Amino acid sequence: HDGFCLWPSEVASEVRGYPWDSMRTGPKRDLLGELFEACREEGVRPGLYYSFMEWESPLYSKSDKSEYVDRVMIPQIKDLIERYQPAVFWPDGEWDFPDTMWKSPEIVEWIYENAANPEEIVVNDRWGQGLRGQVGDYTTTEYDNLGNSSGKGMRKTRPFEECRGVGHSFAFNRAEGYDIYDSRTACVQRLIDLVSRGGVLLLDIG
């Protein structure tokens, strides 16, 4: 949720006042574009993750987040959809505020009306506080493949996707030893379990 952009995003650097995308600093490459091109060459339909929250943005740190939503979030989402035409749009970091604050209804409507691939693109259910399992094209559960929380009931009526890391974290965690990571056997067994119940597995390798 640090907001660093792996594609040429002028607004990210403009708002912060220093380079904050992969074209202006670091590799000076459109890493996202290169990944999408490589995926499509192999017949893989790529998706996009986008974090609503942005921990260190000077605009997100304000109590009134409307300027952040209008100046950063919405323009970036539209840019990503138009530029890369993802098959999946996967927002996250929505849980602290309602969908009206994020302007999610307007964003979803815009995506379905303006995406170059309207017959292909799907969106998940992470659009506002308390809405998981109720909106979007499918439900996302998290570290819940055994069905022992509220996600259990939703899976019976909606397509679902279980997302989790190979360890207990979605990113590098110095506190995790190798014994925390799932074995190959455990990963395969989890995948079989999910698919047998009509779900899919989104495995993060952080």
Annotate each predicted stretch with a short phrase.
Residues 1-206:
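Mature catalytic domains of secreted/periplasmic carbohydrate-active enzymes
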